């Protein structure tokens, strides 16, 4: 595989198969093999970053192989500025998870790391899939290893939490499958030829408004459950509390981003008119989730549950930024997805460190840990300040962009969402004060050991990334900017189209150009910029036998 994207996708799965052949008693070999495989995958993802060309809005490093050509189904993958950082976040957190589980998983270690590597494969696949059915397969595949991670290696109520997680997510996914079939059916009957599941073909298809409303909610419900967006969040606290530390890290760090990513990749460009109609509804639900999650987090006696409810609040900011539907807010939402993965992943890791030593997560059982665990205290406070959004750390940049962009389109919602920032400072600082400061009142906290080598190696990269994004966010923003501009050009060029079903509307040539990855001017950008023709000339990736490939080619 000369394409680093293909290698990054398939190597974890091949590694999982190889580890499955290791004898069960070779625990040390199993752990070391899993760590090496995850590190090699991360190294390959850095090659993706190196190969990624700035200024090009289209998908890069694409691979397309016909799979079921009669139905226009292909194995097509690629990466753009929206998915690039999420792929890197996935490959970064996987070795962190394996290191954090080095001494904490005491049964079926081989099964645990195999499940983690299969989960990594599925998550990367969902981020890079450019065929809608292929995306759905990866989206569903993620459920199986995460269900096992919670149900086998979780806490006392792990079976209940695993089943609740599975039922919530599969219910939304089945509705999305119905929406996928209906969407492709509409395209098939709009023009003679073979159907197509290619995302680029579906971008170029205008859907009548009555169909858009159903399809919008079919897709949006599946992604809202995954975020999770209030009031569909009730599965998340149980899953986090019962999951092992590694499961919580990967669930909060990556899996929840499938929901916000789905809104950006599918909901907005597929159904722009319905998205505009219901943007305020999703903005209101986001603000309710921001405030509700923060208030409930503030009263939690359990550290892990506190961090879990903080995810409901923080990811509400991401959904708010997405449905503000301008360049500033969407760039902030993408960056905040990465920020949340780093800061909340670090917090779950560090809560797991305490739990392994004291076998309790209750705030009342701690106090004065700054004296007995000084290095751990430094790590935890940095992660907490990052979650709060302290200037100089990553959380500030994402929240600032989201609120700035939202204020332009929905000033009332932006003002209300600002209270979530204040509340997050209150509950995070309250937790820090209860755990780390004051006298050591519990004798069991006197002899508690500071962080071990594997815990230091796991958390330091996350801390470094928090500081890097906070100090130099342009490194990340400049790679996503052209793709965000193109997304908004696609959405805005279709919001005022006649509400009839067509696959090549002459009134909106920007749609076809955007589907073919030709550069376009962002109509909603707060920083409008005309991309040069040379900057974004990427050929559209189209399945064999696609009925729209000639149309798109003629448009180009």
What residues fall within each predicted segment?
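C-terminal ends of transmembrane helices
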Residues: 16-27, 94-106, 148-157, 226-241, ...
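Predominantly late transmembrane helices and immediately cytosolic-facing juxtamembrane segments
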Residues: 230, 344-347, 415-447
